[in-house]
């Protein structure tokens, strides 16, 4: 991996190292997950979090089609996801897409906000990047402003 992710975390959030996660949590995604951060919850509860993923595109894949189709990937990957909205996100990332949705995990309603974009480099070609913020739905209003500001500050550096 030649890139690293930088983001100005909101108060109460911190980066999470892979070795802090439960064993097997990233099984099958170890090569794509580039950054994880979470808010430290006040009580034992689902912690609001950010996961940044990088997925290389094949030489025959159309970057524009992959970007638009990546919204379908989250729906297919998580049982019961309902997409609420998807729109261009030029104000956050050139050529980016912003989407949101909801699902239930272990009896907790969750809401996600995902920023997706394509980044091309000479050495590695085109890659799909996604930054997915997730929190309990009942807390989304309280966290949205922080999530939005973190997404604005997020950058991939070589």
Regions found by a protein language model. Give the residues of each.
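Conserved polar/disulfide-associated segments of primarily extracytoplasmic proteins
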Residues: 3, 18-128
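Preference for bulky hydrophobic residues occupying beta-strand positions
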Residues: 7, 101-103, 133
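Surface-exposed amphipathic alpha-helical segments
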Residues: 11-13, 129-158
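Short aromatic-glycine motifs in intrinsically disordered, low-complexity regions
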Residues: 1-8
């Amino acid at each position: 991996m030649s890139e690293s992710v930088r983001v100005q975390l909101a108060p109460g959030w911190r980066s999470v190292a892979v070795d802090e996660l439960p064993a097997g949590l990233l099984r099958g995604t170890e090569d794509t997950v580039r950054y994880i951060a979470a808010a430290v919850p006040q009580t034992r509860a689902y912690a609001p979090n950010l996961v940044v993923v990088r997925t290389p595109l094949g030489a025959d894949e159309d970057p524009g089609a992959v970007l638009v189709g990546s919204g379908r990937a989250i729906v297919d990957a998580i049982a019961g996801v309902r997409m609420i909205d998807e729109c261009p996100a030029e104000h956050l990332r050139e050529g980016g897409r912003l989407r949101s949705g909801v699902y239930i995990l272990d009896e907790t309603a969750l809401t996600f906000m995902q920023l997706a974009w394509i980044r091309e480099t000479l050495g590695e070609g085109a890659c799909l990047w996604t930054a997915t913020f997730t929190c309990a739905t009942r807390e989304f209003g309280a966290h949205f402003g922080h999530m939005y500001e973190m997404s604005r500050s997020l950058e991939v550096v070589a």
